[in-house]
Amino acid sequence: MAREPEKTVCQNRKARHEYFILETYEAGLVLKGTEVKSLRAGKANLKDSFARIQNGELWLENMHVSPYEQGNRFNHEPKRPRKLLMHKSEIMRLWGKTREKGLALIPLRVYFKDGRAKVELALAKGKKLYDKRDDIAKREAEREIARAARGKA
């Protein structure tokens, strides 16, 4: 049987606008049962979420997973901190890098890979306003070039 492709649950599209992505990592996500069901239904939001290292463990903060509709009193808290699973050596390398000024761990997307929930984490540096303006200007220039090329063809 063929492997099923990764199923993306949600993306943090604003992260690429607000940060320079330096490196990306894959981490497992520790979830409760109702959280898995909500994620499979696509009811999650990565806006304003971030990861931090505390006591040698990696935690995902501010990720909103809506309560499961059919869940009863055993439902989960929507914005609870969720543990991320990575090798200890990777966590320590990230800890050293996040000590640098201006670097942060930002989740880019949540997806299912072989039935397990994963998070794509990025080591990112915040953009200044003029960097964002430069990116927008480049994008507009590329659009103009594509529009002109399409008009000639």
From Swiss-Prot:
GO cellular component, one term: cytosol
GO BP term, example: trans-translation
Example of a GO MF term: RNA binding
Annotated transmembrane regions: none
Entry-linked Pfam families: SmpB
Its job: Required for rescue of stalled ribosomes mediated by trans-translation. Binds to transfer-messenger RNA (tmRNA), required for stable association of tmRNA with ribosomes. tmRNA and SmpB together mimic tRNA shape, replacing the anticodon stem-loop with SmpB. tmRNA is encoded by the ssrA gene; the 2 termini fold to resemble tRNA(Ala) and it encodes a 'tag peptide', a short internal open reading frame. During trans-translation Ala-aminoacylated tmRNA acts like a tRNA, entering the A-site of stalled ribosomes, displacing the stalled mRNA.
PANTHER family per the UniProt record, alphabetical: SSRA-BINDING PROTEIN (PTHR30308:SF2), TMRNA-BINDING COMPONENT OF TRANS-TRANSLATION TAGGING COMPLEX (PTHR30308)
Family designation: Belongs to the SmpB family.
Full protein name: SsrA-binding protein
Phylogenetic lineage: Bacteria, Bacillati, Bacillota, Clostridia, Thermoanaerobacterales
